[in-house]
Amino acid sequence: MTDKIQCDYSALDHPAVLARIFHPGSGGVTGPARPNELLIPVDENVQIGACFHVEDKQAPTILFFHGNGEVVSHYDDLGPVYNQMGMNFFVVDYRGYGRSTGSPTVSHMMADCHTILDFVQNLLHKNGFTGSLGVMGRSLGSASAIELA
């Protein structure tokens, strides 16, 4: 077993860097939350928006960190595709994206992905999901996926 390496990402939290990294997507967030949408508490007064497309409690689940300029609702068409392939699909936003509160920073993104993973693992366990859990990221989301690897 290897020890987890702790990284300090605070140097990347400079406003000039953040302005180039994070571009919260617009659109796609209208009306009240749908039944498969959740808010994940990650910090005091900060919640991350998510959407859980469920196929089956025995199916594997993909925890998906989307790309920059996107929000959870942009994956409303892709979730059912994963379901048709026999997988559950759990897509999450970042601070300041979609229904999420707070402001995005690299440090927050990297810390939040650990809290999100814990939340998803607990949610699956409490609700009787028995399939495996995989993590996937696209573009900006690949950093969170690699952080959890």
State where each predicted segment sits.
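Active-site signature of alpha/beta-hydrolase-fold catalytic machinery across serine-
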Residues: 77, 147-148
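An N-terminal hydrophobic leader/cap segment in hydrolases
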Residues: 1-41, 48-51
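The serine-hydrolase catalytic nucleophile loop
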Residues: 67-81
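Alpha/beta-hydrolase fold nucleophile elbow
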Residues: 126-139
